[in-house]
Amino acid sequence: MGRLEGKSVIITGAGSGIGRAASLLFTKEGARLIAVDLSEGVKETVELVKQQGGIAEAVMADAGSEADVSGFIDRAVATFGKLDVIWANAGISGGLKPIAEQTVEHWQEILRINLIGPFLAVKYAMPHMVRQ
């Protein structure tokens, strides 16, 4: 029995990198996972989880969209009956261009994903977690 047996987890940015690695580690310890990403890589992550015997569902969603965040949190609760962990891991960078060549629109997108995304995750997860 793993340390996270029976826990339900959402990880955003689960399509690659740290999000994928965390997804594999959490489910190896028995967590049930809703893996979220905008990229098709999230489906690969879920396949890897299932290959190691884990339970996971892929959700292609925008971690900076209020409607998407509310939706994937509600889906986790509907699927697993509860929500124990939300890891707002999704993030993007400014790229390698000098700042003088970057646009305000690009920086607004960075803030939407990296700052507003975690706020939305907590905002919509908290009521479920407090009830538990």
Language-model-detected regions and their locations in the chain:
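Substrate-binding pocket helix/loop in short-chain dehydrogenase/reductase
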Residues: 97-99, 106-108
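Conserved NAD(P)H cofactor-binding loop of Rossmann-fold oxidoreductase domains
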Residues: 89-95
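Flexible N-terminal pre-Rossmann segment of NAD(P)-dependent oxidoreductases
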Residues: 1-10
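The beta1-alpha1 cofactor-binding region of Rossmann-like NAD(H)/NADP(H)-dependent oxidoreductases
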Residues: 60-72, 104
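Conserved glycine-rich Rossmann-like NAD(P)H-binding loop of the short-chain dehydrogenase/reductase
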Residues: 29-44
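Conserved glycine-rich cofactor-binding loop
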Residues: 15-16
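A short, exposed helix-loop element centered on a Lys and neighboring polar residues
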Residues: 122-123
